[in-house]
């Protein structure tokens, strides 16, 4: 594909994504006004659930609320929320947390907080987050599946031993202190900041917004396959085009979108 054709393609993608996001946001807002209001969706007294720390799988589906997952000094898994219709049920080692309310607009004061014992290692964590801020602090699991909607996402201290699958939405994604054995990341609209360690094979498809990577280790540890979109690409301070760089054991394929890409390395042997 010729450069001008790629430029047209990515501009069209950016316009389409923005248009769809606006239409969906308008439609959800209208449905929210028709079907539910904050007064009926939120309780004055938050509810709390407790579950055994032996839970191995987390399945979370929250259409519209501030969602927080974090490790704490506790012996059980606690779920707290002021959403009236939130359900939290355990079955066969799987904890399913869901707000079934349909057609709900974004509720700025709504929250869901999930606290698990420090040192917990889950087998699978599956999160479907709609409108609202998502924050994850100190989470370890074998498999991580994240489907984002609209809002900022902050992840601090994430360890994934098998594969992380992340579908971006509309909003910034900030990941730091992470250790992931292979990531399949498909960004939407928003800035991406990634700081930590990758191993195995990763595929990253960028959308609309700047992307910054600070990879643990030296450049020799990685094998980069870069296809730039619209914007500059810098690897270790050097501007590059479509290229393959390095022959390290960790392979990362990056398909650029609309926005600059910066890749730096941190480690003793930079």
What are these regions (language model features)?
Residues 1-7:
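N-terminal Lys/Arg-rich, disordered targeting/topogenic segments
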Residues 2, 12-15, 145:
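N-terminal targeting/secretion presequences
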Residues 9-29:
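Hydrophobic membrane-insertion alpha-helices, especially the h-region
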Residues 29-100, 105-107, 111-128, 133-139, ...:
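Short linear S-[DN]-x-LW-Φ motif typified by the pepsin-like aspartic protease active-site region
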């Amino acid at each position: 594909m010729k450069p001008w054709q790629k430029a047209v393609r990515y501009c069209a993608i950016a316009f389409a994504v923005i248009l769809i996001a606006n239409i969906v946001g308008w439609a959800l807002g209208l449905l929210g006004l028709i079907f539910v209001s904050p007064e009926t969706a939120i309780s004055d007294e938050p509810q709390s659930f407790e579950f055994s720390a032996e839970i191995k799988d987390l399945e979370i589906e929250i259409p519209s609320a501030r969602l927080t997952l974090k490790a704490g000094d506790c012996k059980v898994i606690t779920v707290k929320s002021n959403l009236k219709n939130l359900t939290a049920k355990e079955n066969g080692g799987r904890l399913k947390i869901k707000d079934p309310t349909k057609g709900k607009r974004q509720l700025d004061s709504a929250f869901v907080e999930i606290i698990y014992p420090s040192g917990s290692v889950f087998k699978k964590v599956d999160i479907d987050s709609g409108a609202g801020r998502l924050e994850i602090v100190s989470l370890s699991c074998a498999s991580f599946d994240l489907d984002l909607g609209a809002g900022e996402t902050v992840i601090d201290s994430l360890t994934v031993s098998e594969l992380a699958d992340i579908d971006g939405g509309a909003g910034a994604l900030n990941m730091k202190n992470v250790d992931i054995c292979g990531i399949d990341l498909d960004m939407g609209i928003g800035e991406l900041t990634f700081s930590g360690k990758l191993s195995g094979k990763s595929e990253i498809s960028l959308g609309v917004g700047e992307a910054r990577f600070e990879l643990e280790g030296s450049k020799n540890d990685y094998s980069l396959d870069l296809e730039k979109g619209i914007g500059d690409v810098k690897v270790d301070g050097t501007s590059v085009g479509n290229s393959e760089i390095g022959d390290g054991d960790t392979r990362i394929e990056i398909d650029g979108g609309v926005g600059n890409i910066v890749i730096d390395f941190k480690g003793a042997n930079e």
